[in-house]
Amino acid sequence: MNVEEFREYCLSLPGVSEKMPFPNVADRYSRDVLCFYVGDKWFCFVNIEVFDFCCIKCRPEESTELRARYEGVKPGWHMNKKYWNSVYFNQDVPDSIIRELVARSYRLVVESCREGAGAL
């Protein structure tokens, strides 16, 4: 999967928008981060220049299981490690699993918006 295929998949989910929220930070890596939102909440982000991994939200028990199963799943970069995983492209996580994990992350955020005060 390449960055454009990944972006198209994320944007195919209902109500998803995208934004590069860090245009003025000092480090280049963070400036190139593209976040995918449902409502006003992130469910996934990726560096569009390096395209080495995506960071996705997971249930805590799922995060632990995925890290044990795949070398390409690590604790989430710059995120709460209990709920977020970095999933590396072109390692041992098949593209079909990456898409499923993105969809699960999306559903988690949609559920949390419905339960809480987050706008959809």
Can you name each region flagged by the protein language model?
Residues 1-120:
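Charge-dense, helix-prone N-terminal extensions
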